[in-house]
Amino acid sequence: MAKKIIGFIKLQIPAGKANPSPPVGPALGQRGLNIMEFCKAFNAQTQGMEPGLPVPVVITAFADKSFTFVMKSPPATVLIKKAAGITKGSPKPHTDKVGKITRAQAEEIAKAKNADLTAADLDAAVRTIAGSARSMGITVEGL
């Protein structure tokens, strides 16, 4: 018989930097989960990633105080800012442009995010990424 699920916890944690301090500790502690066990497992799985890159994770908590977790790809906005070489988007995205990315860069981001996007094909995924970039004040060349 399957274990009884008591809840899901969604967090964004920097790769390789999970520790018992907030937000990880309080979120897992409320459900009675082993915080250090999660931190060690998460840090081991994100070892090959760029340190500090925020990684969304969904933790499934079970009634017997065990858990499983699924990592998603980093947020598109973080990947877009990294590709454009900026630290934050424009406060007025439709009037003030703060950077630009090429279609090739948008395709690379779309391939990285493909598992998490609901796009039917790569071209639709690229258009989704381009829309996110435009809403941040970043122009997409070649689109």
UniProtKB/Swiss-Prot annotation:
<keyword id="KW-0699">rRNA-binding</keyword>
<dbReference type="Pfam" id="PF00298">
    <property type="entry name" value="Ribosomal_L11"/>
</dbReference>
<dbReference type="InterPro" id="IPR020784">
    <property type="entry name" value="Ribosomal_uL11_N"/>
</dbReference>
<keyword id="KW-0694">RNA-binding</keyword>
<dbReference type="InterPro" id="IPR020783">
    <property type="entry name" value="Ribosomal_uL11_C"/>
</dbReference>
<dbReference type="InterPro" id="IPR000911">
    <property type="entry name" value="Ribosomal_uL11"/>
</dbReference>
<dbReference type="GO" id="GO:0070180">
    <property type="term" value="F:large ribosomal subunit rRNA binding"/>
</dbReference>
<keyword id="KW-0687">Ribonucleoprotein</keyword>
<dbReference type="InterPro" id="IPR036796">
    <property type="entry name" value="Ribosomal_uL11_N_sf"/>
</dbReference>
<dbReference type="Pfam" id="PF03946">
    <property type="entry name" value="Ribosomal_L11_N"/>
</dbReference>
<keyword id="KW-0689">Ribosomal protein</keyword>
<dbReference type="InterPro" id="IPR036769">
    <property type="entry name" value="Ribosomal_uL11_C_sf"/>
</dbReference>
<comment type="subunit">
    <text>Part of the ribosomal stalk of the 50S ribosomal subunit. Interacts with L10 and the large rRNA to form the base of the stalk. L10 forms an elongated spine to which L12 dimers bind in a sequential fashion forming a multimeric L10(L12)X complex.</text>
</comment>
<dbReference type="InterPro" id="IPR020785">
    <property type="entry name" value="Ribosomal_uL11_CS"/>
</dbReference>
<dbReference type="GO" id="GO:0003735">
    <property type="term" value="F:structural constituent of ribosome"/>
</dbReference>
<dbReference type="GO" id="GO:0006412">
    <property type="term" value="P:translation"/>
</dbReference>
<dbReference type="InterPro" id="IPR006519">
    <property type="entry name" value="Ribosomal_uL11_bac-typ"/>
</dbReference>
<dbReference type="GO" id="GO:0022625">
    <property type="term" value="C:cytosolic large ribosomal subunit"/>
</dbReference>
<keyword id="KW-0488">Methylation</keyword>
<comment type="function">
    <text>Forms part of the ribosomal stalk which helps the ribosome interact with GTP-bound translation factors.</text>
</comment>
<protein>
    <recommendedName>
        <fullName>Large ribosomal subunit protein uL11</fullName>
    </recommendedName>
</protein>
<comment type="similarity">
    <text>Belongs to the universal ribosomal protein uL11 family.</text>
</comment>
